[in-house]
């Protein structure tokens, strides 16, 4: 099991400095939110991509994954009834696949709650089918570049589409592909009625990436979420992927969050 930390909480930091802080806190990976690079994925030059890889390598960390894929974009949506919108979305996701592969990330996390809500005027079934079509259209690029797209179930207060791990797993089964798998997020799982360890065990066959956070949106160990049974379940299923710290409350500061989260994770996974 490897530990990473998401970079967006280091607001305004140069990427090399983020990698330095991650390494200093004990992480071996950084999860990259493309919007933090300040421009669309297709505008990031080969030289800039190389610089990101080299910054990570210089500080002894990997770029583990990318997430918040469609954040800070306009006019993109995976289940829009407008075929032109879906075409643009597919094209941009392919750009993100190439960006991810170019910087060394082998996992892309599809959360993007606003760009997946059920579009106005269509049924949930129609939204499902359109989303499946969108993901199927990017499958060749995923396979070509050796990248896995992980669908992230999110709580109903964030989106009305793919709210449970069971729903995400059902969609994943439509593809039967090692390149479309599952991410589980502790905060999101806290909204489900089923205990988090049971969700982990039930989805062992498709679980590829994991977000560690507290139900209160802070880092692991900052709130009341008990990670001991969560860590036990991950070890029970012999999970070998990344455990990545993702927070939504950036206080008191990124270094404190990184250090205390890592200390807590080490204690529960030891």
Regions found by a protein language model. Give the residues of each.
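Active-site acidic/histidine proton-transfer and metal-coordination neighborhood
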Residues: 16-17, 55-59, 75-181
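Flexible, glycine- and charge-enriched loops at secondary-structure boundaries
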Residues: 42-49, 82-86, 121-128, 161, ...
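A short acidic, helix-capping loop that chelates divalent metal ions and anchors anionic groups
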Residues: 36-40, 72-79, 116-121, 157-158, ...
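Conserved beta-strand positions in the central sheet of alpha/beta enzyme cores
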Residues: 31, 65-67, 109, 150, ...
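Histidine-acidic metal/acid-base catalytic patches
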Residues: 1-26, 50-53, 57, 104-106, ...
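Short, conserved active-site loops that position catalytic residues or coordinate cofactors/metal ions
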Residues: 30-36, 65-75, 112-113
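Conserved alpha-helical segments that form or flank metal/cofactor-binding pockets of metalloenzymes
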Residues: 55, 63-66
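Glycine-rich, proline-tolerant flexible connector loops at the mouths of alpha/beta enzymes
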Residues: 33-53, 112-119
């Amino acid at each position: 099991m490897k530990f990473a930390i998401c970079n967006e909480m280091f607001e305004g930091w140069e990427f090399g400095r983020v990698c330095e802080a991650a390494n200093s806190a004990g992480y071996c990976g950084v999860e990259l939110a493309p919007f933090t690079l300040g421009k669309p994925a297709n505008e990031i030059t080969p030289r800039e991509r190389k610089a990101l890889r080299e910054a990570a390598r210089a500080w002894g960390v990997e770029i583990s994954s990318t997430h918040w894929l469609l954040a800070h974009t306009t006019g993109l949506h995976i289940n829009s009834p407008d075929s032109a919108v879906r075409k643009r979305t597919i094209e941009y996701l392919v750009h993100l696949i190439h960006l991810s592969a170019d910087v060394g990330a082998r996992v892309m996390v599809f959360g993007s709650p606003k760009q997946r809500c059920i579009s106005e005027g269509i049924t949930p079934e129609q939204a499902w089918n359109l989303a499946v079509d969108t993901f199927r259209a990017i499958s060749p690029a995923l396979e070509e570049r050796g990248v896995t797209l992980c669908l992230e179930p999110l709580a109903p207060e964030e989106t009305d589409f793919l709210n449970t791990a069971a729903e995400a797993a059902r969609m994943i089964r439509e593809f039967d592909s090692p390149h479309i798998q599952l991410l589980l997020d502790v905060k999101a799982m806290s909204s489900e009625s089923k205990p988090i360890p049971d969700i982990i065990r039930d989805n062992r066959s498709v679980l590829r990436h994991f977000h560690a956070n507290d139900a209160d949106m802070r880092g692991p160990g900052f709130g009341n979420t008990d990670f001991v049974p969560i860590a036990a379940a991950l070890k029970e299923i012999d999970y070998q992927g990344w455990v990545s710290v993702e927070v939504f409350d950036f206080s008191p500061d990124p270094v404190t969050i990184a250090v205390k989260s890592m200390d807590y994770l080490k204690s529960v996974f030891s």
